[in-house]
UniProtKB/Swiss-Prot annotation:
Tissue: Highly expressed in brain. Also detected in heart, lung, intestine, kidney, testis, spleen, liver and muscle (at protein level).
Gene designation: Cnrip1
GO cellular component: cytoplasm; GABA-ergic synapse; glutamatergic synapse; myelin sheath; plasma membrane; presynapse
MF terms (GO), sorted A to Z: type 1 cannabinoid receptor binding
Full protein name: CB1 cannabinoid receptor-interacting protein 1
Subunit note: Interacts with the cannabinoid receptor CNR1 (via C-terminus). Does not interact with cannabinoid receptor CNR2.
Disulfide bridge partners, by residue number: none
A Gene Ontology BP annotation from the UniProt entry: regulation of trans-synaptic signaling by endocannabinoid, modulating synaptic transmission
Free-text function comment from the UniProt entry: Suppresses cannabinoid receptor CNR1-mediated tonic inhibition of voltage-gated calcium channels.
Length: 164
């Protein structure tokens, strides 16, 4: 086991396929558990791109709402700052969220040797007939996290989450 990094910075980007379209969120205020809701379409595929610093860290998959997404190492960014992984998240078979409701979905990403990144996204899944609703709100490119691994190498504490 190597040294435990003081801080881990990671970003998670979602792009709807087949044309790398943006994903949107809306600000719900205090009506639900979180003030931001990510809008996703059922029966769709999303490219997941995970970027990690320090570049020595390794992951094999990310679980999004119980769906295991294998991640493939793509290499380092041109500036060498972060390592890049990609995978495909498929919402086929996911039930649309009822009107006026939101779904908390668990996100987990186990890192080799330093513990598991965990967070919860508040999501609304729209069925294909309401796909225009998925494009109301604010587009985001990436969700960035600043995390601190704990000493037992089991979990990482999330210090900061930013939608950019």
């Amino acid at each position: 086991m190597g040294d435990l990094p003081g801080l881990v910075r990671l970003s998670i980007a979602l792009r709807i396929q087949p044309n790398d379209g943006p994903v949107f969120f809306k600000v719900d205020g205090q009506r639900f558990g979180q003030n931001r809701t990510i809008k996703l379409l059922t029966g769709s595929s999303y490219k997941v791109e995970v970027k990690i610093k320090p570049t020595t860290l390794q992951v094999e998959n990310i679980s999004i709402g119980g769906v295991l997404v294998p991640l493939e190492l793509k290499g380092k960014e041109p500036d060498g700052e972060r390592v890049v992984y990609t995978g495909i998240y498929d919402t086929e078979g996911v039930a649309p969220t009822k009107s006026g409701e939101r779904q908390p979905i668990q996100i987990t990403m186990p890192f080799t040797d330093i513990g598991t990144f965990e967070t919860v996204w508040q999501v609304k899944f729209y069925n294909y007939h309401k796909r225009d609703h998925c494009q109301w709100g604010s587009p985001f490119s990436v969700i960035e996290y600043e995390c601190k691994p704990n000493e037992t190498r089991s979990l990482m504490w999330v210090n900061k989450e930013s939608f950019l």
